[in-house]
Amino acid sequence: MENAIRNAFTMKVKSGFETEYKIRHDQIWPELTALLSESGICDYSIFLDEETGILFGVQKLSSGFDRSQLSSHPLMRKWWNHMSDIMETNPDNSPKTNSLKEVFHLD
């Protein structure tokens, strides 16, 4: 993806649910991965700090990526509901996220 924007953020899995978080992502719905790709997300990884439960997400976004459009999609909301019992979430069940500032990059 040319002119991709790197995006990094943190989330938090509830204590004791780290394995379940991994299982659910191992079984991610194919239609959700298609939606993420079609929305302009690629090269997406999530890492877990096992001591703190902090999740570190990093992804590349197309220049035309529209977060509000993805956030309002019924399938995205269904996934959030599916994950809400094991993550720290906002009132709409979206995961609580903390955007990170890039301070170094090497191609």
Swiss-Prot record:
One BP term from GO: rhamnose catabolic process
UniProt pathway annotation:
Carbohydrate metabolism; L-rhamnose metabolism
Q: Which SUPFAM superfamilies match?
A: Dimeric alpha+beta barrel
Where are the residues of the annotated region Disordered? Answer: 88-107
Which portions of the chain have biased composition (kind: Polar residues)? 90-100
User: Could you state a single Gene Ontology molecular function term?
Assistant: L-rhamnose mutarotase activity
Any one GO cellular component localisation term in the record: cytoplasm
Its keywords, alphabetically, are: Carbohydrate metabolism, Cytoplasm, Isomerase, Rhamnose metabolism
Protein name (database record): L-rhamnose mutarotase
Q: Where in the cell is it found?
A: Cytoplasm
Q: Which residues bind substrate per the record?
A: 21, 44, 79-80
Q: What does this protein do?
A: Involved in the anomeric conversion of L-rhamnose.
Q: Name one Pfam family in it.
A: rhaM
The record's EC number reads: 5.1.3.32
Reactions it catalyzes: alpha-L-rhamnose = beta-L-rhamnose
**Subunit structure and binding partners:** Homodimer.
**Residues at the active site:** 25 (proton donor)
Q: Which family does it belong to?
A: Belongs to the rhamnose mutarotase family.
